């Protein structure tokens, strides 16, 4: 094997902007715009909702907060238990703990690195909600997980941070559960 060095560095976590993007941000700031109330946010929310095929889209500052807000929206409180896969970004479990709720960690399938219907069924009665993480766009039997959650009247929160633009059986990931979260953090994929 030969190691090939790239001529251009591709930053993984450090922001990388084109001159057009940098100038647009500069122009916005110089026009008196607040960085925390970016007037183009509503436009982005509308365009993302249309792209994914959903009614509502709300931007927040990070993925942990997005998952916490989603859990609040489906009724999770400090006394709740939430099924969380063991193989995920720590933010998934941290979002549960941020609300004072208890994560119930479960193993993932070897073939997909995500929770399986069998795992969900084995734990569904002991939890108040299920978080499904479509890690690296790898999904299998999601419709069965949706069915189990509906049967037991447990909300399904989709952590689709790594699946923006991906589909499963022709349907956009992030549209199967009761609510979903996405992320624009640099390690996450967009398709």
Label the model's feature ranges:
Residues 34-81, 95-98, 105-107, 171:
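Phosphate-binding glycine-rich loop
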Residues 158-191:
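Conserved active-site segment immediately N-terminal to the catalytic lysine
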Residues 72-160, 167:
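PLP-dependent aminotransferase-like
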Residues 1-34:
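N-terminal "arm"/small-domain region of PLP-dependent enzymes with the aminotransferase-like
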């Amino acid at each position: 094997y030969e190691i090939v060095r790239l001529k251009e560095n591709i930053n993984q976590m450090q922001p990388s902007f084109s001159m057009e993007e940098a100038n647009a941000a500069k122009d916005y700031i110089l026009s008196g715009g607040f960085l925390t109330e970016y007037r183009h946010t509503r436009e982005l929310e509308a365009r993302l909702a249309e792209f994914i095929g959903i009614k509502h889209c709300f931007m927040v500052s990070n993925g942990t907060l997005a998952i916490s807000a989603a859990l609040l929206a489906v009724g999770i409180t400090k006394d709740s238990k939430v099924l969380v896969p063991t193989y995920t970004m720590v933010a998934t479990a941290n979002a549960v703990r941020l609300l004072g709720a208890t994560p119930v960690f479960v193993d993932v399938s070897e073939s997909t690195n995500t929770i399986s219907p069998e795992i969900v069924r084995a734990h569904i009665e002991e939890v108040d909600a299920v978080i499904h993480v479509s890690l690296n766009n790898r999904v299998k039997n999601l419709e069965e997980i949706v069915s189990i959650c509906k049967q037991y009247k447990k909300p399904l929160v989709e952590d689709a941070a790594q699946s923006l633009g991906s589909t499963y059986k022709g349907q956009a990931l992030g549209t199967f559960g009761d609510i979903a979260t996405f992320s624009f953090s640099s390690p996450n994929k967009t398709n």
